C-alpha cells in the first residue's frame, strides 16, 4: 500500500495510504481533501481534479491523453507538472508520490 503525500491549497500536508488500483483522485478525496472537487466523478470531463505532480515522479506516470491535455488547457494554472488526478492509477511504483492540489480556476 503506497503512501501518497498531498499538499492542500492552504499548505497542509496529508500523508495518505493508497490502495493500488484506485485513481489518485479517489485516494485524495477519500483521504479528506474536500477541496479536490472532481465534479465529473473521474470521467475526464471537468478538470476539477487538477494537481501539480512533483517533477521527480512525472516519468513514472502514464502518458497524458489528448482529452486530458485539452481539459488542462482550460486552466489558468496549467504548467509542465499539471495532471488530472482522475487519470492516474495508483500502483506500487508511485510510493512516495508528492502532489499539490492546483489553485481553483
Curated annotation (Swiss-Prot):
PROSITE patterns (alphabetical): 2FE2S_FER_2
Similarity annotation: Belongs to the adrenodoxin/putidaredoxin family.
MF annotations from Gene Ontology: 2 iron, 2 sulfur cluster binding; electron transfer activity; metal ion binding
Keyword Protein transport: no
Cofactor entry: [2Fe-2S] cluster
Function: Component of the chloroacetanilide N-alkylformylase multicomponent enzyme system involved in the degradation of chloroacetanilide herbicides (N-alkoxyalkyl-N-chloroacetyl-substituted aniline derivatives). In vitro, functions as an intermediate electron transfer protein.
Co-factor remark: Binds 1 [2Fe-2S] cluster.
Gene from which this protein is expressed: cndB1
Disulfide pattern: none
UniProt xrefs under PANTHER family: FERREDOXIN-2, MITOCHONDRIAL, FERREDOXIN/ADRENODOXIN
Residue ranges constituting the 2Fe-2S ferredoxin-type domain according to the UniProt record: 2-105
Source taxon at top rank: Bacteria
Protein name: Chloroacetanilide N-alkylformylase 1, ferredoxin component
Keywords: 2Fe-2S, Electron transport, Iron, Iron-sulfur, Metal-binding, Transport
Annotated InterPro entries: 2Fe-2S_ferredoxin-like_sf (IPR036010), 2Fe-2S_ferredoxin-type (IPR001041), Adrenodoxin-like (IPR001055), Beta-grasp_dom_sf (IPR012675)
Biological process (GO), any one: P450-containing electron transport chain
UniProt subunit comment: The chloroacetanilide N-alkylformylase multicomponent enzyme system is composed of an oxygenase component (CndA) and an electron transfer component formed by a ferredoxin reductase (CndC1) and a ferredoxin (CndB1). In vitro, chloroacetanilide N-alkylformylase assays in which CndB1 is substituted for CndB2 demonstrate that the two enzymes possess nearly identical activities.
